């Protein structure tokens, strides 16, 4: 029986203001039906993720990046109608990060994922 797996390549850095940097994992391997959690970590630690909104983008091979969602808080977030609710985000303030969750992962989710941070919503 063949095993079909998905790989996620995570790229950064979109923000570099006053030596502030976003860091992401290089790669994540998951199987269809599993949960993928992709972290976007803000550093240095004196700059807190609490103060920023995070936008997430997906780029499939051979395609332009596609806006997935924006998350600042439970009260301030946005996901376009054409993006499935399998994609969600939340902040992990203990690790100064925003986490994109894909649940359950589907074969078409095989892509590169990018994050960017800012003070307001801007797809």
Swiss-Prot record:
Sequence ranges assigned to domain Ig-like in this UniProt record: 21-123
Record's keyword annotation contains Isomerase: no
Flavoprotein among keywords: no
UniProt-listed Gene3D superfamilies: Immunoglobulins
Tissue: Expressed in B-cell precursors. Expressed in fetal liver, bone marrow, spleen and lymph node.
UniProt xrefs under InterPro entries: Ig-like_dom, Ig-like_dom_sf, Ig-like_fold, Ig_sub, Ig_V-set, IgV_Light_Chain
Signal peptide segment: 1-20
Keywords: Disulfide bond, Immunoglobulin domain, Signal
Highest taxon of the lineage: Eukaryota
GO biological process assignments: immune response
Disulfide bonds: 40-115
Coiled coil residues, start to end: none
One GO term describing the cellular component: extracellular region
PROSITE patterns the UniProt entry points to: IG_LIKE (PS50835)
Family affiliation: Belongs to the immunoglobulin superfamily.
Role according to the record: Associates with the Ig-mu chain to form a molecular complex that is expressed on the surface of pre-B-cells.
Protein name listed in UniProt: Pre-B lymphocyte protein 3
Organism lineage string: Eukaryota, Metazoa, Chordata, Craniata, Vertebrata
């Amino acid at each position: 029986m063949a095993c079909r797996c998905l790989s996620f390549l995570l790229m950064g850095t979109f923000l570099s203001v006053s030596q502030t940097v976003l860091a992401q994992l290089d790669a994540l391997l998951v199987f269809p039906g599993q949960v993928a959690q992709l972290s976007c970590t803000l550093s240095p630690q004196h700059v807190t993720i609490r103060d920023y909104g995070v936008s997430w983008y997906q780029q499939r091979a051979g395609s332009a990046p596609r806006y997935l969602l924006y998350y600042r808080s439970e009260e301030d977030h946005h996901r376009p109608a054409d993006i499935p609710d399998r994609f969600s985000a939340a902040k992990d303030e203990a690790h100064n990060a925003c986490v994109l969750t894909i649940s359950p992962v589907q074969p078409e989710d095989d892509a590169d994922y990018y994050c960017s941070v800012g003070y307001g919503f801007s797809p």
